[in-house]
Amino acid sequence: MTLQQEIIQALGAKPHINPEEEIRRSVDFLKAYLKTYPFLKSLVLGISGGQDSTLAGKLSQMAIAELREETGDNALQFIAVRLPYGVQADEQDCQDAIAFIQPDRVLTVNIKGAVLASEQALREAGIELSDFVRGNEKARERMKAQYSIAGMTHGVVVGTDHAAEAITGFFTKYGDGGTDINPLHRLNKRQGKQLLAALGCPEHLYKKVPTADLEDDRPSLPDEAALGVTYDNIDDYLEGKTLDSAIAKTIEGWYVKTEHKRRLPITVFDDFWKR
């Protein structure tokens, strides 16, 4: 088995999908989990206004609405969480995503004060954060807020990770990578677009340039610029296509280098890192 085949198998990626079937699969998956643990009453998700959180949010709201109708349990709710750092540059996109999703409840937690307080506490301890590490602080603060909300609403935190992010480890460890349930796992980036199109999402929300937008020195830095490859490259790789060797090497390099992000904390029984 080639490394490409190994990666595709590990991430559950498929070269072709039926969008309607995958929508149903994700919604039923979320419903089944909640039905298995009836003490859970909410799905909690941070909404940024980008493709991934818009899709995960819509699927979550669909799952909650269907389950509420089926069970008569009106305590069930989907909570969309706005998590700006100060003023969000693409505020209108976030509002448009909320309008599309129609969540049961919308909360806004501005993380800037908490991040600055953490940065100051570290500074007083003699640790001066780089802009990159401050970006990771933002991602982790967002997840901290979501887990606090989930803890107070008997909920689980929904993730937005998908195959095209997982393969490169393009997420913050214990930040946006630290979630309870990931309904998009297995899908590549273009397949996510197909699901949103089938759901009637406004095109500008899934055709916009993807960005984590975590760094102050490089605001709205495109994911593709940070990775050195395009999402089309990554999607082609995940679909089993043959790529230019340099591009394939870059993608595989990211996969190997970030394997620790896709694992639980390393123990003496683990040997994946020795490859």
From Swiss-Prot:
Binding-site positions, Mg(2+): 52, 165
EC class (word): ligase
Keywords in alphabetical order: ATP-binding, Ligase, Magnesium, Metal-binding, NAD, Nucleotide-binding
Organism listed in the record: Salmonella paratyphi A (strain AKU_12601)
Residue positions binding deamido-NAD(+): 140, 173, 180, 260-261
GO CC, alphabetical: cytoplasm
Catalytic activity as recorded in UniProt: deamido-NAD(+) + NH4(+) + ATP = AMP + diphosphate + NAD(+) + H(+)
Recorded family membership: Belongs to the NAD synthetase family.
Pfam families: NAD_synthase
A Gene Ontology biological process term: NAD biosynthetic process
Function: Catalyzes the ATP-dependent amidation of deamido-NAD to form NAD. Uses ammonia as a nitrogen source.
Transmembrane helix in keyword set: no
Complex formation: Homodimer.
Protein name (database record): NH(3)-dependent NAD(+) synthetase
Keyword Phosphoprotein carried by entry: no
Record EC number: 6.3.1.5
GO terms of molecular function: ATP binding; glutaminase activity; metal ion binding; NAD+ synthase (glutamine-hydrolyzing) activity; NAD+ synthase activity
Pathway: Cofactor biosynthesis; NAD(+) biosynthesis; NAD(+) from deamido-NAD(+) (ammonia route): step 1/1
Binding of ATP, residues: 46-53, 160, 189, 211
